[in-house]
Amino acid sequence: MKTYQQLTDHLKTIEKHEIHDSASQSYITFVHEFMDSLNEFCSKHQNAFDGQFYNILLENNISWDIKDMSNTDVTSLDEKVILALILGATKDVSFYEGALLPYIENRSLERWLRRLEYFDSFSATN
């Protein structure tokens, strides 16, 4: 399995465009499955990410808010920053399942996962 495949496998669900209502069962299922994958990934890859998402965002001049995180150009960001964006977006999910919806609707989560997919494809060729 590629490093980020556990997370990027969720792109298939995002692409179906069936998860754009926070009250729908498909959205709720997606959030639970994605969060399970993210938590498992973080516990398996502690060396790839030190868990300090907020500091990583600040170091890269990214505010922890929907607008700034969503408008961030990811083309030059490394894996650590992409993971910090994802963790920042999911931080409030335990309090409010709908917290991830804006990042799905504006396609930020998809862009971030595609960037991780790029890193997996790049590492596979080297």
Give the ranges of each region predicted by the language model.
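N-terminal acidic leader/helix
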Residues: 59-77
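Amphipathic alpha-helical binding modules
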Residues: 84-126
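Short terminal alpha-helical segments
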Residues: 1-54, 111
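Short amphipathic alpha-helical heptad-repeat segments
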Residues: 3-7, 72-92
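Helix-start/N-cap signature of alpha-helical segments
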Residues: 27, 75-78, 101, 105
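Repeat-associated, polar segments at repeat-unit boundaries in modular proteins
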Residues: 49-63, 108-119
